[in-house]
Swiss-Prot record:
Organism listed in the record: Myocastor coypus
GO cellular component: extracellular region
Record's protein name: Insulin
Highest taxon in the source lineage: Eukaryota
Keywords: Carbohydrate metabolism, Disulfide bond, Glucose metabolism, Hormone, Secreted
Family: Belongs to the insulin family.
GO terms classed as biological process: glucose metabolic process
Known function: Insulin decreases blood glucose concentration. It increases cell permeability to monosaccharides, amino acids and fatty acids. It accelerates glycolysis, the pentose phosphate cycle, and glycogen synthesis in liver.
MF (Gene Ontology): hormone activity
Length: 51
């Protein structure tokens, strides 16, 4: 995974791919700002995966 800007369905699809069976939650703290407005790293995406 290369850090990149992800928006809309591309962001959701990438979260499914990164989190796999753990799933992910819908945070209120700005995933769109982190990953759509700015460039998002794999570690940033993984922080939204369920434990």
């Amino acid at each position: 995974y290369v850090s990149q800007r992800l928006c809309g369905s591309q962001l959701v699809d990438t979260l499914y791919s990164v989190c796999r069976h753990r799933g992910f939650y819908r945070p209120n703290d700005g995933i769109v700002d982190q990953c759509c407005t700015n460039i998002c790293s794999r570690n940033q995406l993984m922080s939204y995966c369920n434990d």
